[in-house]
Amino acid sequence: MRSIKVAVLLSGLLAGGCASGTNTWVELDGQRYQVEIADDDAERARGLMFRDEMAADHGMLFIHDQEEPQAYWMKNTRIALDILYFDNARRLVSQQRDVPPCALGNGCPPYPSDAPARYVLELNAGEAARLKLENGAELTFSPAIPRP
């Protein structure tokens, strides 16, 4: 397996690092989530690390430079998450549900996508099941989210 893109999925962003606020939202299967954006290496590496909670209607959207196989891990992540992978067309191509927190540092396992992805959405664990998400679901972006 190629080296894990230290797109350390979930991490708690740097102050002022990621775009956030009421204008940055995504919609998935009729449910709107306020998202923080991680669109550079530093933001993707930090992700949701060191957070103790995330509001029910919030998440983090990781934007990669190109569509390719992705692998995320839970290093220093304290909350369980659903990791959802989307292609260039913003269609759901892979899901890692109910991924547990990991305190093993570099010993945390990877959670790879089953198909190439450009966008990764992290939500609180259980959201994918609650929405009954199936691959092919479309992710809609608010106008404030940057388009690569």
Model-predicted segments: where are they?
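C-terminal motif of bacterial Sec signal peptides marking the signal peptidase cleavage site
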Residues: 15-17
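Sec-dependent signal peptide recognition
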Residues: 2-9
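Compact, glycine-rich, soluble single-domain proteins
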Residues: 19-148
